[in-house]
């Protein structure tokens, strides 16, 4: 997941296309892609002190 976050940070236009459903991640269907984007948003928008991935 960290690799995906780094990719989104380096290529924000790719994230924009994913959010607009103009693209999807290879190997993931649209629903899985939406789940990944939600996880990214939840992580990225979280307070840096409380940022952590699930156990």
Swiss-Prot record:
It is found in: Secreted. Its main location: secreted. Trp-53 is modified by farnesylation, which is essential for activity. Modified by the tryptophan prenyltransferase ComQ before export to the extracellular environment. The type of isoprenyl derivative differs among the different pherotypes and depends on ComX primary sequence. Residues 1-45 form a propeptide. Keywords: Competence, Lipoprotein, Pheromone, Prenylation, Secreted, Sporulation. GO terms for cellular component: extracellular region. One of its GO terms (biological process) is sporulation resulting in formation of a cellular spore. One of its GO terms (molecular function) is pheromone activity. A lipid is attached at residue 53 (3'-farnesyl-2',N2-cyclotryptophan). Part of a major quorum-sensing system that regulates the development of genetic competence. Acts through the activation of the two-component regulatory system ComP/ComA composed of a sensor histidine kinase, ComP, and a response regulator, ComA. Activation of ComA leads to the direct regulation of over 20 genes and expression of over 150 additional genes, including those involved in competence development, appears to be controlled indirectly. Under certain conditions plays a role in sporulation. Interacts directly with the sensor histidine kinase ComP and stimulates its activity. The DNA sequences encoding comQ, comX and the N-terminal two-thirds of comP show a striking polymorphism, which determines the specificity of the quorum-sensing system in the different pherotypes of Bacillus. In ComX, the sole conserved residue is the modified tryptophan essential for the activity. This is ComX pheromone. It comes from Bacillus subtilis (strain 168). The lineage of its organism: Bacteria, Bacillati, Bacillota, Bacilli, Bacillales. The gene is comX.
